[in-house]
């Protein structure tokens, strides 16, 4: 009989409702190395103390419910309950708090992102006592992360497979994203790869529609890959989107890609689901396929600052579930992403050990031990004038992906690819020579234009294109 059971038997069961903070707010608690730690941005309803709100989050995402129950006496709540162990006000905001919650490791199934999220964020976000709730960060202990395979291959293995080192990889999303026949789609893939790109990509919503069934697309893209490889002497790839309506169909598509001998497949991990993604990642490791991950639907979850879940949490979850690439914003393009915040979760994707750094939005020190890293993909509204900034921001271990910035070239797809490859090589050379990419960006690109008419034409087309909007989700700073 557990100590708690003995206590219950001694004093008798007392029915009723009691404040969550009496059981789940424990500021004296010292976190364990094996705890999963969570940082929640809590906005309580008027009249709800922050301690009660934080305790409610801990309770409703672990062992608690709205009233006392008889069966509490049949287990040890002290062993299994979540604990709100610290609360702090959010800088520059009124009635917002960061509530830190510790969860015992035994609450979670090994190797299951699905179970982890079902517990931590599955129910509590609809709790009436909270006006809004956002999961800002998680600390995944090595004791839990080691139960996951993680990325199928990781950064170093991918570079070895491709035999490409010392620079970012270049990609292109085929446009228009919907409506092309499989043959015309394959033609665009070939032209881009022949022009100097490393990868081309299915858009996230290209699955198997009436205008282009998946098997036809796979065959024409494989033909384009082999033809471009033969002409350039470089290893090429196309992200064949295996996302489907069922897990069984998804695996059939991945198997077809393997039989065609292509190097990489793709999955929409949020719309497809973490269970499907983990299954696909395991298949990819066992069969030598790289796995590109698109984050379609992420902004529904992560864009609002006071409610939902920050992308750094989704990025950590993806690294655990498995993926070799994931879209991570651009900072300079058309999609949301503040620089320091973006660099924070880029490091969480790539590095083995990341120190706590609130200036970049990192709430906890994260040790991935030996889990392979994930290449961040910069994609969305970028073109050749952005190349110096992208090279400086993301470094070598990244994929820079230009869709309209390749296919929108006035001379065609292959010249668009040439322009991007020349711009990238010029930026890498300038950086290696010690030049300041941020300060000399325009000069570096203009110098390269002298040797590449394709780049000069691209620069002329996109010289006035900028996306200068303030990001919605920004780091917390004190307001004057």
Curated annotation (Swiss-Prot):
<keyword id="KW-0150">Chloroplast</keyword>
<feature type="modified residue" description="N6,N6,N6-trimethyllysine">
    <location>
        <position position="14"/>
    </location>
</feature>
<dbReference type="InterPro" id="IPR020878">
    <property type="entry name" value="RuBisCo_large_chain_AS"/>
</dbReference>
<keyword id="KW-0113">Calvin cycle</keyword>
<feature type="binding site">
    <location>
        <position position="379"/>
    </location>
    <ligand>
        <name>substrate</name>
    </ligand>
</feature>
<feature type="active site" description="Proton acceptor">
    <location>
        <position position="294"/>
    </location>
</feature>
<feature type="propeptide">
    <location>
        <begin position="1"/>
        <end position="2"/>
    </location>
</feature>
<feature type="binding site">
    <location>
        <position position="204"/>
    </location>
    <ligand>
        <name>Mg(2+)</name>
    </ligand>
</feature>
<feature type="modified residue" description="N6-carboxylysine">
    <location>
        <position position="201"/>
    </location>
</feature>
<keyword id="KW-0460">Magnesium</keyword>
<keyword id="KW-0479">Metal-binding</keyword>
<feature type="binding site" description="via carbamate group">
    <location>
        <position position="201"/>
    </location>
    <ligand>
        <name>Mg(2+)</name>
    </ligand>
</feature>
<dbReference type="InterPro" id="IPR036376">
    <property type="entry name" value="RuBisCO_lsu_C_sf"/>
</dbReference>
<feature type="binding site">
    <location>
        <position position="295"/>
    </location>
    <ligand>
        <name>substrate</name>
    </ligand>
</feature>
<dbReference type="GO" id="GO:0016984">
    <property type="term" value="F:ribulose-bisphosphate carboxylase activity"/>
</dbReference>
<keyword id="KW-0601">Photorespiration</keyword>
<dbReference type="GO" id="GO:0000287">
    <property type="term" value="F:magnesium ion binding"/>
</dbReference>
<keyword id="KW-0120">Carbon dioxide fixation</keyword>
<feature type="modified residue" description="N-acetylproline">
    <location>
        <position position="3"/>
    </location>
</feature>
<keyword id="KW-0456">Lyase</keyword>
<keyword id="KW-0488">Methylation</keyword>
<feature type="binding site">
    <location>
        <position position="177"/>
    </location>
    <ligand>
        <name>substrate</name>
    </ligand>
</feature>
<dbReference type="InterPro" id="IPR017443">
    <property type="entry name" value="RuBisCO_lsu_fd_N"/>
</dbReference>
<keyword id="KW-0503">Monooxygenase</keyword>
<dbReference type="InterPro" id="IPR033966">
    <property type="entry name" value="RuBisCO"/>
</dbReference>
<feature type="active site" description="Proton acceptor">
    <location>
        <position position="175"/>
    </location>
</feature>
<feature type="binding site">
    <location>
        <position position="173"/>
    </location>
    <ligand>
        <name>substrate</name>
    </ligand>
</feature>
<feature type="binding site">
    <location>
        <position position="203"/>
    </location>
    <ligand>
        <name>Mg(2+)</name>
    </ligand>
</feature>
<protein>
    <recommendedName>
        <fullName>Ribulose bisphosphate carboxylase large chain</fullName>
        <ecNumber>4.1.1.39</ecNumber>
    </recommendedName>
</protein>
<comment type="function">
    <text>RuBisCO catalyzes two reactions: the carboxylation of D-ribulose 1,5-bisphosphate, the primary event in carbon dioxide fixation, as well as the oxidative fragmentation of the pentose substrate in the photorespiration process. Both reactions occur simultaneously and in competition at the same active site.</text>
</comment>
<dbReference type="InterPro" id="IPR020888">
    <property type="entry name" value="RuBisCO_lsuI"/>
</dbReference>
<dbReference type="InterPro" id="IPR000685">
    <property type="entry name" value="RuBisCO_lsu_C"/>
</dbReference>
<keyword id="KW-0007">Acetylation</keyword>
<keyword id="KW-1015">Disulfide bond</keyword>
<feature type="site" description="Transition state stabilizer">
    <location>
        <position position="334"/>
    </location>
</feature>
<keyword id="KW-0934">Plastid</keyword>
<keyword id="KW-0560">Oxidoreductase</keyword>
<feature type="binding site" description="in homodimeric partner">
    <location>
        <position position="123"/>
    </location>
    <ligand>
        <name>substrate</name>
    </ligand>
</feature>
<dbReference type="Pfam" id="PF00016">
    <property type="entry name" value="RuBisCO_large"/>
</dbReference>
<feature type="binding site">
    <location>
        <position position="327"/>
    </location>
    <ligand>
        <name>substrate</name>
    </ligand>
</feature>
<dbReference type="GO" id="GO:0019253">
    <property type="term" value="P:reductive pentose-phosphate cycle"/>
</dbReference>
<dbReference type="GO" id="GO:0009507">
    <property type="term" value="C:chloroplast"/>
</dbReference>
